[in-house]
Amino acid sequence: MDSNTVTSFQVDCYLWHIRKLLSMRDMCDAPFDDRLRRDQKALKGRGSTLGLDLRVATMEGKKVVEDILKSETDENLKIAIASSPAPRYITDMSIEEISREWYMLMPRQKITGGLMVKMDQAIMDKRITLKANFSVLFDQLETLVSLRAFTDDGAIVAEISPIPSMPGHSTEDVKNAIGILIGGLEWNDNSIRASENIQRFAWGIRDENGGPPLPPKQKRYMARRVESEV
């Protein structure tokens, strides 16, 4: 087993322990607690795969971190913080849109890559726009907060959201989830369009001229994927 893999796991275990202490002392917010639960499940899975005990790994991780901190200067810390890119947040939806409750007449749900896809299969022949709130790092979608599908009159007919109890998701997970959602809605002859932010940061597409939300190749891939699932 690669020593760097073991060391990385040990440090992750110890840092999770520190975050857990903050949570136990009510020194963190709800998103922090959500990430803590997701990361706990991920660490258990990694520990099982690597055949490492979590308690032992945590203690070893503490030693590694302490050794690093002994040689760390305040100046080095300032340089590291200044050079680290910070994610920025994109908000297609207002607070009202992202928090509004909605209901499905013919519900369909699917879990993919740590994301829950929900859609109302009773919706037919509608023009639908996808909007999302998410963080961006290095000009690419990093973490999805919520994606919802709206009809022209503002009704919510579908949604993609992270599952708190599961590990985090990747950009590819988000793309796949959007593909499932688009395919499911287009199955009932709905016309789907993604916001410019989704196009740009999920697929790297700029759509200033009002073109289709996805390139033909991506559309064909999604259609094939969904046909096998619907």
Swiss-Prot record:
Compartments, record wording: Host nucleus; Host cytoplasm
InterPro entries linked: NS1 (IPR004208), NS1A (IPR000256), NS1A_effect_dom-like_sf (IPR038064), uS15_NS1_RNA-bd_sf (IPR009068)
Motif (Nuclear export signal): 137-146
Region described as Disordered: 209-230
One MF term in the entry's GO annotations: protein serine/threonine kinase inhibitor activity
Disulfide bond positions: none
One GO CC term on file: host cell cytoplasm
GO terms (BP aspect): symbiont-mediated suppression of host cytoplasmic pattern recognition receptor signaling pathway via inhibition of RIG-I activity; symbiont-mediated suppression of host gene expression; symbiont-mediated suppression of host mRNA processing; symbiont-mediated suppression of host PKR/eIFalpha signaling; symbiont-mediated suppression of host type I interferon-mediated signaling pathway
Region of interest: CPSF4-binding: 180-215
Pfam family of the protein (one): Flu_NS1
Record text on subunit structure and interactions: Homodimer. Interacts with host TRIM25 (via coiled coil); this interaction specifically inhibits TRIM25 multimerization and TRIM25-mediated RIGI CARD ubiquitination. Interacts with human EIF2AK2/PKR, CPSF4, IVNS1ABP and PABPN1.
Domain free text: The dsRNA-binding region is required for suppression of RNA silencing.
Purpose: Inhibits post-transcriptional processing of cellular pre-mRNA, by binding and inhibiting two cellular proteins that are required for the 3'-end processing of cellular pre-mRNAs: the 30 kDa cleavage and polyadenylation specificity factor/CPSF4 and the poly(A)-binding protein 2/PABPN1. In turn, unprocessed 3' end pre-mRNAs accumulate in the host nucleus and are no longer exported to the cytoplasm. Cellular protein synthesis is thereby shut off very early after virus infection.
Protein name: Non-structural protein 1
Source organism: Influenza A virus (strain A/Mallard/Alberta/88/1976 H3N8)
Organism classification: Viruses, Riboviria, Orthornavirae, Negarnaviricota, Polyploviricotina
Gene: NS
